[in-house]
Amino acid sequence: MQKYEIGKCITTLNKMSLSRDFKNYISKIRFPHYKNFESNTTIDFSFPLTVLVGKNGTGKSSILYALYGAPKNSNTGNFWFSTATDPIEEQDENKVRQSFVYSFFDENGIEKNLLNLRILSKKGDPNYWESSRPVKLYGLDPSQPRPKKIDKNIIFLNFKSIISAYDKFFYFGRNGTKSSSQKLLYGQETGRVYNDRMRFIRRKSKQLDSVLNGNTTIINGPYKKPQNSKAIKLSKEEIYWISDILGHSYSSGLIINHKFYGTWGYSIYLKQANFGYTEAHAGSGEFATVLLVHDLLNINENSLVLLGSVLKLLK
């Protein structure tokens, strides 16, 4: 993207009102007690785009997990939960529970504050987070009514977890076993494991090729269960941005979700002027960029978009 285009986007966003032009906009998040954060650490979201930067272990992902739990039907405990090896401190010396407070603008443009606490659910789940009435201990006015959790579509793309269909099988096997996969990963085993997996991929890639070339739409497996979804053709706008980000000129591309290699996963196909290739011959940054651009250009308006570990893959 040219500097002029970036500047134009920033100018447009600066002219927009966070309270009027963005539905249920999260304007601030505060952490009375959260992980190893300093008490009442606060982040203001005074611009629609926020980039969290810092060394490893400074809490960037932890902030994303909290924001993920802000809208209704989403829960921070899906990503941060207690185990025998990594227990979570229930409360600090002042009896303040693990918590965060986020501020947002309601439909009338009025800023509201909502407290979220990590509590024991009715079903006995200790990793459940629930909104709470305002409590003085958490810096809120108890006389104020409890707002409802914001109703907002959310998309969380954590690129640490995005693995292509090819990489899932080649590095972890059909059942995700690691015993031989680790040896393969570090070059300690180049015989049977390599040969078995290459033979399997060569055989099953014929099915993938048939779908990518449009010869077949859906391939059924045992009991007539579909082994893939319909291939998605990337739009001209998607191809433009993928080319811009990666610095190559692509003419077309496809995304397909399938289980030809044993487990469900995504494959991509990118075509340049004289050749095309799948994620098997693409870098992890190419694969991640295709999914990122496709998802961002197809989300609903006023969605909360959280991106984790993006720069690591685009370096």
Show where each model-derived region lies.
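P-loop NTPase switch/coupling surface
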Residues: 1-193
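Extended helical coiled-coil dimerization/tether regions that scaffold
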Residues: 2-18, 161-281
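Secondary-structure boundary elements
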Residues: 22, 244, 248-249, 297-304, ...
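Glycine-rich, often proline-containing surface loops adjacent to acidic residues and nearby aromatics
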Residues: 25, 46, 301-309
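Short, flexible loop segments at the rims of nucleotide/cofactor-binding pockets, characterized by
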Residues: 29-30, 281-283
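Catalytic acidic motif of RecA-like/P-loop NTPases
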Residues: 50, 310-314
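GG-anchored amphipathic helix commonly corresponding to the ABC/SMC/Rad50 NBD signature/C-loop
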Residues: 67-70, 267-276, 282-307
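A short catalytic or substrate-binding loop motif that flags glycine-/basic-rich loops and adjacent residues
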Residues: 91-96, 259-262, 284
